[in-house]
């Protein structure tokens, strides 16, 4: 059971990241979603997957539009990188249910506690695995994933090209890389992906000021 101090630190980290999201290698907890709440004030404080956090995220970030552009289907295996507290992860899990699996990664173990609580509350704890990874290692098994999702997180990587080079072997044949971010991060994201050997398949700009691009590895 985590101390109140640890909970408050996690909350402070997430609050600082609220404007950008994303954990990657720079800031922990919140690429796909970073809101948190806590129950209690003493040493027994517990993660609380607040419905208010989810509602606010859904309104501001329009995750249904993002997920709809990913082409997810039941049974798919997805890596949600820099998943934070799971505000987007819950939508991804819903899209691959039943039969699918989501590995939600982050560099912050405390933030992943909130993600696990959110998945349990939503009924997706059986298909979502919270996984702590290092800042420079994707921590993904080779030849496993139908989709690797980077949602407002790649701009935190110290070296996009190095990270993508390590992540690419985790994709199955025909698997895709999805990058969703604000428009000011589009050019470096595309440049990094293309330098690793990806080419863009589709790009959607349904959410104002944001892009969602799907990439596949060159033959």
Question: What are these model-predicted stretches?
Answer:
Residues 108-110:
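Conserved SAM/SAH-binding beta-strand->alpha-helix loop
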Residues 13-15:
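C-terminal motif of bacterial Sec signal peptides marking the signal peptidase cleavage site
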Residues 123-136:
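Conserved SAM-binding strand-loop segment of SAM-dependent methyltransferases
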Residues 17-20:
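Bacterial signal peptide processing site
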Residues 145-160:
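A short SAM/SAH-binding and catalytic strip from SAM-dependent methyltransferases
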Residues 136-148:
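A short acidic, Gly/Pro-enriched loop at the edge of an enzyme's catalytic core
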Residues 75-84:
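Conserved class I S-adenosyl-L-methionine
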Residues 93-94, 161-176:
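A short glycine-rich, Lys/Arg-flanked "PGG" loop and its adjoining helix->strand segment in the class I
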């Amino acid at each position: 059971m985590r101390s109140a101090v640890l909970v408050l630190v996690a909350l402070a980290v997430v609050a600082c990241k609220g404007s950008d999201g994303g954990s990657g290698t720079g800031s922990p907890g919140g690429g796909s979603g970073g809101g948190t709440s806590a129950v209690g004030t003493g040493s027994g404080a517990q993660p609380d997957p607040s419905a208010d956090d989810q509602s606010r995220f859904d309104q501001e970030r329009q995750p249904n539009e993002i997920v709809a552009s990913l082409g997810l289907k039941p049974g798919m295996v997805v890596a949600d990188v820099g998943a934070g507290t799971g505000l987007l992860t819950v939508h991804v899990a819903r899209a691959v249910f039943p039969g699918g699996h989501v590995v939600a990664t982050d560099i912050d173990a405390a933030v992943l506690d909130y993600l696990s609580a959110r998945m349990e509350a939503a009924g997706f704890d059986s298909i979502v695995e919270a996984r702590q990874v290092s800042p420079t290692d994707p921590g993904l098994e080779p030849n496993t994933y139908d989709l690797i999702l980077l949602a407002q997180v790649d701009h935190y990587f110290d070296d996009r090209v190095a990270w993508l080079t390590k992540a690419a072997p985790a994709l199955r044949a025909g698997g895709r890389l999805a990058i969703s971010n604000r428009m000011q991060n589009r050019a470096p994201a595309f440049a990094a992906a293309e330098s690793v050997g990806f080419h863009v398949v589709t790009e959607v700009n349904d959410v104002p000021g944001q892009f969602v691009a799907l990439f596949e590895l060159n033959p």
